[in-house]
């Protein structure tokens, strides 16, 4: 997994959905700082958040882990 690629993907999908980091964080019950760290590739979302994040971004968990839409990584 490439943290930077995943972060860019999260950023792209969040912006496509018209959400701020604060709004996405509020929906996931995390801080905007946590979302910022994911997007900058400094950390990854906790495994317990992946499904909720995927729902908010309207993608599959595997697409988040690949950092690309339409790509499926075997989990």
Report the location of each language-model feature.
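Short, charged recognition helix plus adjacent turn
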Residues: 65-75
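Short, conserved catalytic or interaction motifs in soluble domains
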Residues: 40
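Short alpha-helical DNA-recognition segment
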Residues: 18-37, 52
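DNA major-groove recognition helix of helix-turn-helix/homeodomain DNA-binding modules
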Residues: 48-63
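Short coil turns linking two alpha-helices in DNA-binding domains
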Residues: 2, 20, 31-34, 46, ...
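A short, Lys/Arg-rich alpha-helix, primarily the initiator
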Residues: 1-16
């Amino acid at each position: 997994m490439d943290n930077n690629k995943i972060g860019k993907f999260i950023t792209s999908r969040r912006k496509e959905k018209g959400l701020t980091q604060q709004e996405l964080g509020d929906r996931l019950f995390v801080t905007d700082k946590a979302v910022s760290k994911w997007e900058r590739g400094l950390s990854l979302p906790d495994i317990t958040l992946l499904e909720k994040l995927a729902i908010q971004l309207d993608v599959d968990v595997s697409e988040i882990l690949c950092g690309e839409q339409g790509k499926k990584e075997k989990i």
